[in-house]
């Protein structure tokens, strides 16, 4: 595309504000289509991120040319379609208040989307007709979500509709993928995450296949507990036959997942969880593999995600074996012969003989009664786990006892598994009054509160409160695929508020991950997030009542989430002073004591925060994912929408300030695959600040996780990044995380060669843990 027009356009754009007349540009195309211009500008991103910005604006302009110019018209055109997905009630609300909605919506805000963002919106979130033609703009989608939240009940709350639209369209907050593409439709399944517990009887085994398939078809991600299924070759008294164990059942769920895709928009997404004492643990650990005997015999199930539910007892035995203090003996059981091991947990970690350790007590009781069906060592299990992690990045590790002992809902029942991305932890069970866990997710853009004089913690608190009310309304307005999901959600009313853009905050404030000030700020940010959510949930309880399972909860006793960590010995009692100092008095000891007293009177939601992956939100807004460091300073992001070059704009701005963003530096950055650690022309201070997630010591990620985890009601999707697959390195951070009381041991463990050995732009598909994991991505 070597024309005067394109070269002039490129030179005008480079490093400038991009005040481009898109109508004039479109008329001047002559022989080139808008799509060709978009592709060309995107390819020039390596020179400057402004090229990507222009490509995004061209893409938005292209969409605007083919869609309705007002919100009500867009809705009218969709409603007129023979196979319209829109709910008649939603359409009626839009028609009734169309003057307000049409005048308030601001289509110019579409031009704030990144290229990755607008293309993701086109591909996944914007409603289409039966022929696949896009029928709305991003602003229409934001308004549709806002109306779904505040306009579908008994009262149409115009004020809150407009406020929510404003927060969404300015990218201060985001709602989860199912909410985005199902809001306003005839079957509004708005929830992201579902947790199922599979019982050991044929009827329930197949019921869970059906239930998971129905949930997946509506866009939900699923976590299944398999720990209660009897092991292979166990006797079945009813039939006189032997059990097939978990292997065939996992393969059945694997096939179901592949068939039941998420509304045709993306593949289905299931995670299966198992406890380490289960006799079939070694089979379970081999099933995700793409290579090896089971894979060659097609006895694997590689489309599923896998998770281990790890008790303290196993970690203690493993640590003793590592340090030659014990032989690592670990007993294996079949749950039909050793029942309820997955239904109990250790309330304390103490080794004192009177400590409340129900799991440990029952485990050794079954050992004494010789109910075990096999004996191995803790090291053998962890080695087998590691072989699989090297290939596929999981099984995840969830610390069972930490999750349960720090749960506000520990009085409800034992948490036996998590969800697709190991950040949601809700009790679930089958049988009488079955409950299937459900959680609605949203996230706050931390970068939205960066100010010239520091960080706006008050703004973050307010935004967290707004999201809390949004999610609470979604609980009442959403569609539930089963009565057990409705029962659980109405009883506990759990929500999961996450974050994205933490790395953007640190880069803007010139902090580096791992520094004392960064760790303190990480703690303070998540304290503010939790505080804002709890404060608003208390206010909502006064207006609408507490969640039915509130009596007996930790909050009903005046215990906040960080108090549970103090009680367990994993957080110092001085945390309030640290937060007060970091927030410069926005949150004081008095603030927290007032919150405790108010919480005892009632709380609307059983859970408040959960730190999920946020790949889609990050794509849309140009911010870094969740709480993670930058994975690279230059990479190609693979999504369902295609491949897009992403450049770290903060690094570019810092280099421009010192006149170092030159062609030579650009080429070195490209040759190094996005790393600047060996570009010695760049000052050491900048190189240190822009270490990527893989280049920094992984203990830094653990320490940051330990700082924020006390303010997380549920858990977090904690990734680790390593150059080489060395078990000792991985065990170091896992044991450190366990000792610090983390609830998640690991989400994905990524391994790859050093960036300096790569001569092409990093193809960073790992950044989002694969596109099929997006059910709980935002």
From Swiss-Prot:
Activity modulation notes: Under complex allosteric control mediated by deoxynucleoside triphosphates and ATP binding. The type of nucleotide bound at the specificity site determines substrate preference. It seems probable that ATP makes the enzyme reduce CDP and UDP, dGTP favors ADP reduction and dTTP favors GDP reduction.
Enzyme category, top tier: oxidoreductase
Reported induction: Expressed in the early phase of the viral replicative cycle.
The UniProt record lists the keyword ATP-binding: yes
Highest rank taxon of the organism: Viruses
Keywords from the named record: Allosteric enzyme, ATP-binding, Deoxyribonucleotide synthesis, Disulfide bond, Early protein, Nucleotide-binding, Oxidoreductase
Cysteines joined through disulfide linkages: 193-439
Active site: 419, 421, 423
GO biological process: deoxyribonucleotide biosynthetic process
EC number(s) reported in the record: 1.17.4.1
Pfam families on file: Ribonuc_red_lgC (PF02867), Ribonuc_red_lgN (PF00317)
Nucleotide-binding keyword on record: yes
Interacts with thioredoxin/glutaredoxin, annotated site positions: 773, 776
UniProt site positions, description: Important for hydrogen atom transfer: 193, 439
Site (Allosteric effector binding): 200, 230
Residues bound to substrate: 177, 192-193, 221, 419-423, 613-617
Catalysed transformations (reactions): a 2'-deoxyribonucleoside 5'-diphosphate + [thioredoxin]-disulfide + H2O = a ribonucleoside 5'-diphosphate + [thioredoxin]-dithiol
Subunit structure: Heterotetramer composed of a homodimer of the large subunit (R1) and a homodimer of the small subunit (R2). Larger multisubunit protein complex are also active, composed of (R1)n(R2)n.
Function: Ribonucleoside-diphosphate reductase holoenzyme provides the precursors necessary for viral DNA synthesis. Allows virus growth in non-dividing cells. Catalyzes the biosynthesis of deoxyribonucleotides from the corresponding ribonucleotides.
Record family assignment: Belongs to the ribonucleoside diphosphate reductase large chain family.
Name assigned to this protein: Ribonucleoside-diphosphate reductase large subunit
The organism's taxonomic lineage, starting at the top: Viruses, Varidnaviria, Bamfordvirae, Nucleocytoviricota, Pokkesviricetes
């Amino acid at each position: 595309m070597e024309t005067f027009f394109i070269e002039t356009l490129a030179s005008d754009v480079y490093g400038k504000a991009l005040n481009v007349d898109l109508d004039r540009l479109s008329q001047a195309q002559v022989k080139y289509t808008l799509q060709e211009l978009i592709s060309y500008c995107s390819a020039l991103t390596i020179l400057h991120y402004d090229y990507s910005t222009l490509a995004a604006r061209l893409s938005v302009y292209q969409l605007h040319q083919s869609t309705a110019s007002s919100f009500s018209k867009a809705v009218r055109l969709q409603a007129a379609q023979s196979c319209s997905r829109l709910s008649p009630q939603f359409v009626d609300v839009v028609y009734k208040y169309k003057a307000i909605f049409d005048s308030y919506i601001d289509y110019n805000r579409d031009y704030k989307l990144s290229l990755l963002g607008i293309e993701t919106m086109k591909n996944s979130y914007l409603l289409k007709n039966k022929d696949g033609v896009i029928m709305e703009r991003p602003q229409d989608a934001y308004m549709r979500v806002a109306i779904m939240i505040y306009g579908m009940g008994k009262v149409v709350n115009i004020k809150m509709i407009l406020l929510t639209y404003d927060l969404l369209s300015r990218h201060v907050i985001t709602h989860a993928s199912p909410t985005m593409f199902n809001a306003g439709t005839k079957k509004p399944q708005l929830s992201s995450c579902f947790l199922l517990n599979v019982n050991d009887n044929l009827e329930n085994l197949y019921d869970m296949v059906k239930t998971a398939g129905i949930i997946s078809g509506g866009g939900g991600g699923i976590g299944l507990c398999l720990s209660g299924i009897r092991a292979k070759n166990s006797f079945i008294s009813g039939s006189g036959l032997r059990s097939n164990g978990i292997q065939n059942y996992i393969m059945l769920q694997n096939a179901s997942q592949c068939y039941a895709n998420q509304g045709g928009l993306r593949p289905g997404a299931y995670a299966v969880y198992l406890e380490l004492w289960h006799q079939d643990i070694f089979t379970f650990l081999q099933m995700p593999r793409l290579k090896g005997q089971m894979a060659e015999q097609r006895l694997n199930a590689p489309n599923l995600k896998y998770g281990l539910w790890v008790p303290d007892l196993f970690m203690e035995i493993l640590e003793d074996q590592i340090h030659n203090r014990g032989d690592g003996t670990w007993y294996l059981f079949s749950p039909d012969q050793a029942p309820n091991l997955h239904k109990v947990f250790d309330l304390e970690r103490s080794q004192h003989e009177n400590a409340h350790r129900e799991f440990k007590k029952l485990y050794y009781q079954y050992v004494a009664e010789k109910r075990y069906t096999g004996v191995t060592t803790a090291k053998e299990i962890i080695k087998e786990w590691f072989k699989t992690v090297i290939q596929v990045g999981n099984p995840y590790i969830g610390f069972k006892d930490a999750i349960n002992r720090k749960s506000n809902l520990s009085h409800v029942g034992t948490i036996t598994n998590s969800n697709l991305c190991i950040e949601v932890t809700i009790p679930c069970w089958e049988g009488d009054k079955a409950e299937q866990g459900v959680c609605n997710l949203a996230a706050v853009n931390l970068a939205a509160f960066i100010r010239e004089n520091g960080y706006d913690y008050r703004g973050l608190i307010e935004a967290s409160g707004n999201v809390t009310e949004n999610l609470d309304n979604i609980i009442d307005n959403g569609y539930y695929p089963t009565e057990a999901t409705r029962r659980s959600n109405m009883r506990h009313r759990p929500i999961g508020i996450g974050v994205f853009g933490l790395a953007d905050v640190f880069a803007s404030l010139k902090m580096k991950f791992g520094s004392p000030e960064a760790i303190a700020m990480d703690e303070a940010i998540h304290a503010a997030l939790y505080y804002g959510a709890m404060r608003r949930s208390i206010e909502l309880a006064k207006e609408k009542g507490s969640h039915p399972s509130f009596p007996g909860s930790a909050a009903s006793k005046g215990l906040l989430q960080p108090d549970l960590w103090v009680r367990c010995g994993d957080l110092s009692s001085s945390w309030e002073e640290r937060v007060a100092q970091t927030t410069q008095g926005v949150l004081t000891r008095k603030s927290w004591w007032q919150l405790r007293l108010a919480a005892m009177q009632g709380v609307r939601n059983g859970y408040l925060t959960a730190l999920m992956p946020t790949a889609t939100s990050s794509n849309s807004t140009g911010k870094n994912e969740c709480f993670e460091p930058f994975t690279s300073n230059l990479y190609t992001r693979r999504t369902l929408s295609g491949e897009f070059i992403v450049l770290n704009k903060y690094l570019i701005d810092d280099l421009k300030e010192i006149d170092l963003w030159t062609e030579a530096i650009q080429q070195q950055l490209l040759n190094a695959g996005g790393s600047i650690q060996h570009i010695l022309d760049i000052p050491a201070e900048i190189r240190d600040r822009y270490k990527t997630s893989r280049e920094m010591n992984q203990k830094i990620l653990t320490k940051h996780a330990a700082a924020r985890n006390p303010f997380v009601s549920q858990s977090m999707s904690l990734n680790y990044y390593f150059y080489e697959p060395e078990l000792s390195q991985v065990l170091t951070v896992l044991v450190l995380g366990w000792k610090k009381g983390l609830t998640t041991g690991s989400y994905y463990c990524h391994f790859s060669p050093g960036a300096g050995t790569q001569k092409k732009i990093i193809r960073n598909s790992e950044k989002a843990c694969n596109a099929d994991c997006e059910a709980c991505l935002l």
